[in-house]
Amino acid sequence: MSCFSHVMNPITGENSWQEREDDYDYHQEVANAGFGDMLHDWERNQKYFAALRKTIKGMRAAGREVHVLDIGTGTGILSMMALKAGADSVTACEAFLPMANCAAKIFTDNGVGDKVQLIRKRSTDIKIGADLDMPQRANLLVAELLDTELIGEGAISIYNHAHAELLTDDALCIPARARCYAQVAQSPLASQWNSLKILPNLDGEALLRPPEQLKSCKGEAALHDVQLSQLPAGTFRLLTEPIEIFQLDFQRKEKREKQREKLVQLQASQPGAAELVFYWWDIQLDDQGEILLSCAPYWAHPELKELSASKEERVPVANVVPWRDHWMQAIYYVPKPPQLATVGQDFYLSCHHDEYSLWFDAMLEAPAKTVRRHTCSCDLHMTYSRSRIGQLNQAIRNKRYLRYLEATIVPKQSNVLVLGNGCMLGLASAALGAASVQLHEPHRFSRRLIDSIVQHNELKNVKYVENVEQLEDTELIALSHVFAEPYFLNAILPWDNFYFGTLLMKLKDKLPEKVEISPCEARIFALPVEFLDLHKIRAPVGSCEGFDLRLFDEMVERSAEQAVSLVEAQPLWEYPSRALAEPQQLLSVDFANFNVDHHLQGSIELTQSGVCNGIALWVDWHLDKTNNPKSIVSTGPSEAVVPGEFVKWDMFVRQGVHFPRKPTDLSGRVAWSTDFKPLLGQLKFGFSQEKR
């Protein structure tokens, strides 16, 4: 049975009723739960298994029975490991019912259905006693309750409850403890994700300056989770060695503190601005701390030397450390970065955590009082994503737009309509002397931010438009330019910004014949690639450490077919991929004739050997009709694609990715089709791999 759901279409900008199966939400939750990524993490699996074997063997040698509690069992893999390692009893709990039901089937399929007690509820709801959830307390807890911040999934409270209510006084835990690390760094590139810089003209002179409220804003304390190993080597400078800032003892019977702070005195290893804190953690899986799993970036990884010695020739050194997407590293932005003038200069790092998150500050003098968690006071950080803030600062991108604007804006004559959210470049046309600039800014916070920039730069003749259909005919006929980047807050995939075309069509009949429309055209390109790792987030698991997980694969595949888009958004700079062909154009859209339907098909010859496990897609925006590379703004590769080489991707936008259901390493071609119906806001792609 199906039902209708209210869905926002980013291309039309309208809510529409969409027919979906009753269990669509269930399928979406299953497909996006992320269990598959963890199961492809070979280091995690092997080291958890090794810790279970070692710990259970030690408990047996001490004459103890082993009663295991597995909190958040997922597929049940850790419970099955515990049984195989010799546990007397295993109780597994899982509150996510689709996953719990799948685990029950997996237990049966692996011949342990009658050996694992499965409780379909949260661990904090479990009761101990006869005829209750568990007959007795467990003396070995195995769990994976961690995220990139370590504590973001509620690990502190869950462990506190488990020790108080579910575990014996002498219980052991896997992992036994965790250690958090920080490393202070400077990076002009990464800082672009956090604050708005001066926008210069083509001569390098300031065109738009950020107002005082932006310069004084401390930003958001929230983490920026990234694959730190993929930051280009020349784009950051490490100002300190990694330091341990917090330890979390999972085995301790006493409660783990929900709030802690630590002031660390550091010495600069080189001069620079203490702009960033790089953060990661490691876990000691066994009580003796001999089995270590580290989430460190490659340069700080404790096993880098051993891993580098056995790496494949074509794998970059940044990718020799075990890959995982469920536990990454994080960047925290220092509110007011202190300048470290000399090697060896003392400064202080103030480290804090509450029950779910961390925050940091750095200063030259020890603070007299506790450093409070900082929040955005300028609208920038609460309105825009990190990638969008970086986009606003991207020099090459901005120069291409300004090149167009400086060439076409006639001071005191041009009348400009700017479509999009937070379009600083459109605002620049006012600074270039346009007679009037009308900004389409329906979003309240975005409009307030833009207005603060208008006021600070004393720009005249700027007007805000909430709805383009409210524009008077006399205003429209006077327009010389309709300009966009385009960028809209609702956009997820690059072509969601085709909403620019939808807005244009609402005005088309009232615009003057010679009005300049920029961008005038958009082209979508596709590139078959071989990912080193990203494909694993959608790849079937099959078996893991000798356990059959095909039932899990089938469940996820069924749900993905129902609820996962054929193309999803990913920041590809974080996930190395090798080009298997030249990029090919799949669609060209003329914004002056946006309402035309398109149906196209073709094929891409694979010119390089390798496994085509992904197809990357992006949009090139053509600012004018010259086809001059300097008039094209791409959301794809930042350098020319060379088949067989790793692709360098734009770091300030997410690209689209299609993951083939069954990738092959057969040489041949990728057949594709594109179906675009702009009035319905439908853009569909089809891909299939064919032998040559």
From Swiss-Prot:
- Gene3D superfamilies per the record? Hnrnp arginine n-methyltransferase1 (2.70.160.11), Vaccinia Virus protein VP39 (3.40.50.150)
GO function term, MF aspect, one:
protein-arginine omega-N symmetric methyltransferase activity
Which GO biological-process labels does this protein carry? peptidyl-arginine methylation
- EC number(s) on record? 2.1.1.-
Tell me which UniProt keywords the record has, alphabetically.
Methyltransferase, Repeat, S-adenosyl-L-methionine, Transferase
Q: Where is the SAM-dependent MTase PRMT-type domain?
A: 14-359, 368-692
Note the superkingdom of the native organism. Eukaryota
The UniProt entry's sequence similarity note says: Belongs to the class I-like SAM-binding methyltransferase superfamily. Protein arginine N-methyltransferase family. PRMT7 subfamily.
Q: What does this protein do?
A: Essential arginine methyltransferase that can both catalyze the formation of omega-N monomethylarginine (MMA) and symmetrical dimethylarginine (sDMA). Specifically mediates the symmetrical dimethylation of arginine residues in the small nuclear ribonucleoproteins SmD1 and SmD3.
What name does the UniProt record give this protein? Protein arginine N-methyltransferase 7
